[in-house]
Amino acid sequence: MNNNLVAEGDVEKYQRDGAVVLRSVLDDQALGELAIAVEQNMQSPGPWANEYAANSKQGRFFDDYVNWSRFDAYKKHALTGALAQIALELMQTTSGRFFHEHVLVKEAGNNQVTPWHNDDPYYGVNSNNSVSLWVPLDPIPEKIALRTIKLRRDFDKNFIPRRFVDQTAYVNDARGYEQFPEPQLLDESTDIESFAAMPGDIVAFHFRTLHSAPATTDYEGRRRVISFRYVDTDAVWATRPWKTSPPLEPNSLRPGDLLTDERFPLISR
């Protein structure tokens, strides 16, 4: 591994705050290959693709996930090279598993805000050690940048997730889960960080880290991002009191089983 990709201070910040930005860690070749794959993905969506602005005059908002087996660039960069090694370094482990990739493309003029949420309750896996690598393919200025809230005790809880479209809770009550905090409370947090980024940079955040992103209503450019998501080898299959996202089938996995099937490839260093 190129030790310059992740400095000791970056690891410390990630472990402390649940988020960190790494500057200029992907080269032009990697970015070009991923950009081509995103265009191919948009032309040939997977079964779980969404169009959040499909029936309006506003800019397109496309998202899709778990297509790494269809597009070689996703697979290549998820499993080998810089991304996998960065994930392992931030998780402070020598081996882990790739969970999935997630493509998010907001065209200019889209009014869909990505509301505050953390990813953990949406997923059908449990892992205390995890990381999402948020990879921008376009310049991300401050006005449309990803925002996170430092992972502190007040917000490091099991929350009932909310729907992005109308912010309603998935369920009214669930054992072991709390209602999600009011957005205004989160907006007023003194622990918010905003990560303006350029192609080649990566924003890394834990599955339990609260994060959000503004609309692109007043922005003239595209915002293409791929998130690559990883877990430690002790991650286990889990059920939730709601439909998980991605809606993966258990196949032979039972709650508490390690993620040892081929859908979750092993990475190591």
Where do the model's predicted regions map?
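Double-stranded beta-helix
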Residues: 141-210
